[in-house]
Amino acid sequence: MFRTGNSGWLAIAMIAATCLLTASVGWAQAQQRDTFQVNYFSNANNKEGIDETVRIINPGADAPTFPPSSLCAMIYVFDNEQELKECCGCLISTDGLAELSLDKNLVSNPFDGRSPTNGDIKIVSAAANDNFGGVPCDPTGGGIGSNGKYVLNIVPTVDLRSWGTHVQNDRKLTEDEYQTATLSTGELDSLQEECYGIVSVGSGAGICGEGVGNSSTVCN
């Protein structure tokens, strides 16, 4: 009977541990999903002059610290051939709103001089990392360190929410919320490395905001 009792308690303990582990993993995955947002853009720089707008807010609702801190919107703009064209970081204070013009801020300074008409925008909600020319948000994740390896110091942090308008083919303007997706380590590393790759060889090109070296200016 003693052995049977021990076995029973052991089984209960194992089940409880499994439940806790599952809950912990689920929470971590939810946190990662809530830090990565994606959307498309279409018909940029159209002859009618109808622009699209990206709006990003920092509600402070799910912030891991109190009082809630400012967060970086790390922005990566791709064309429809999966090539990164521009990247930038924008510091947004709690309850703050950033409004970015697609034509003027996000596709006007491609690293290769070819502005995309259609593509997608990826936004990582992250803690400030203060390495991009002395401003708080570095979308390259610190670039390459003295050891010759990528620093990769972006820390995804929950809270930012984003919306975007879209110019449809009939030139009607629609708006929707950015969709959340799970941010894998591989994707996060790739975004930082690709961003560093284009801004390090672009001589000012490849940075969002009409060539302004300080990308936080986009949001002021």
Label for each model-derived stretch:
Residues 25-220:
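Gly/Pro-rich, tryptophan- and cysteine-flecked surface segments typical
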Residues 1-30:
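Sec-dependent, cleavable N-terminal signal peptides
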